[in-house]
Amino acid sequence: MKVTLIAILTCAAVLVLHTTAAEELEAESQLMEVGMPDTELAAVDEERLFECSVSCEIEKEGNKDYKKKKCKGGWKYKFNMCVKV
């Protein structure tokens, strides 16, 4: 009985792994077809470009010397504004 259960579970695991691998290969083959536009890849490239431009802007803005505002009466300067402490 235990051997049968182990065999069934093993077959199920192999089937799941095989199905997953087949889906990955099919997705890769669709991306590699010559006639198809690479919209998925273009979206990834666009996202990376956006991330790069944002990080570059942060680096540029980070080098500027900002004058901290003076906050009074129990207020503390944080996040470019006075916050109650």
Swiss-Prot record:
Residue positions assigned to the propeptide: 23-48
Record localization: Secreted
Matching InterPro entries: Hwtx-2-like
Annotated signal sequence range: 1-22
Family affiliation: Belongs to the neurotoxin 12 (Hwtx-2) family. 02 (Hwtx-2) subfamily.
Tissue: Expressed by the venom gland.
A GO cellular component entry from the record: extracellular region
Disulfide bonds: C71-C82
A molecular function (GO) term: toxin activity
Record's function text: Postsynaptic neurotoxin.
Keywords, alphabetical: Disulfide bond, Neurotoxin, Postsynaptic neurotoxin, Secreted, Signal, Toxin
Protein name (Swiss-Prot/TrEMBL): U4-theraphotoxin-Hhn1f
UniProt main location, coarse: secreted
Organism in which the protein naturally occurs: Cyriopagopus hainanus (Chinese bird spider)
Keyword set includes Protein biosynthesis: no
